[in-house]
Swiss-Prot record:
Taxonomic source organism: Aspergillus fumigatus (strain ATCC MYA-4609 / CBS 101355 / FGSC A1100 / Af293) (Neosartorya fumigata)
Pathway: Aromatic compound metabolism; 3,4-dihydroxybenzoate biosynthesis; 3,4-dihydroxybenzoate from 3-dehydroquinate: step 1/2
Residue positions of the active site: 23, 100
UniProt entry tagged with the keyword Lyase: yes
Name listed for the protein in its UniProt record: Catabolic 3-dehydroquinase 2
Record: residues binding substrate: 74, 80, 87, 101-102, 111
Site (Transition state stabilizer): 18
Record gene name: qutE2
Job of this protein: Is involved in the catabolism of quinate. Allows the utilization of quinate as carbon source via the beta-ketoadipate pathway.
Pfam families named in the record: DHquinase_II
Length: 150
């Protein structure tokens, strides 16, 4: 069965309570359950992973090599700081989609730069938690189905 790894970075465990005017009221467990259900409906297994620690995220990316068809990642604040996560994603050669709940380009200047975007198969920014659904749709349609053709 094709598979997607969903990674959520720092502070995303606070979804539903942290700045709900920006991030909404959906909690991380609700988001993960919804993502798994949508993926299953498309015949795709989705595994979710969250960490507030850069090294643990890197370790999980490394573990995905050879076992995962696509990665969906919301790196949180590591978007703007982590060359190490960038290098891990490049190193495992698994296509990835970068997701952000808010429009990072409409926020503080320091949030405008991403160390991941230029290497991502796609970037989904500012669609709220629907961005995760869009990422699953894209991964299933464009990344996984393309692999099955070849």
């Amino acid at each position: 069965m094709p598979s997607i790894l969903l990674i959520n970075g720092p502070n995303l465990n606070l979804l539903g309570t942290r700045e709900p005017h920006l991030y909404g009221r959906t909690t991380l467990p609700q988001l993960e359950d919804n993502a798994k259900a949508l993926a299953a409906a498309k015949g795709v297994k989705l595994e979710s992973f969250h960490s507030n620690h850069e090294g643990r995220i890197i370790d999980r990316i490394h573990e995905a090599r050879g076992h995962t068809d696509a990665i969906i990642i919301n790196p949180g604040a590591f978007t703007h700081t982590s060359v190490a996560i960038r290098d891990a994603l490049i190193g495992v050669s698994v296509p990835f989609i970068e997701v952000h709940i808010t429009n990072v380009h409409a926020r503080e200047e320091f949030r405008h730069h991403s160390y991941l975007s230029d290497k991502a198969a796609a970037c989904i920014i500012g669609l709220g938690t629907y961005g995760y659904e869009a990422a699953i749709e894209y991964a299933a349609r464009e990344i996984i189905s393309a692999k099955e053709v070849y």
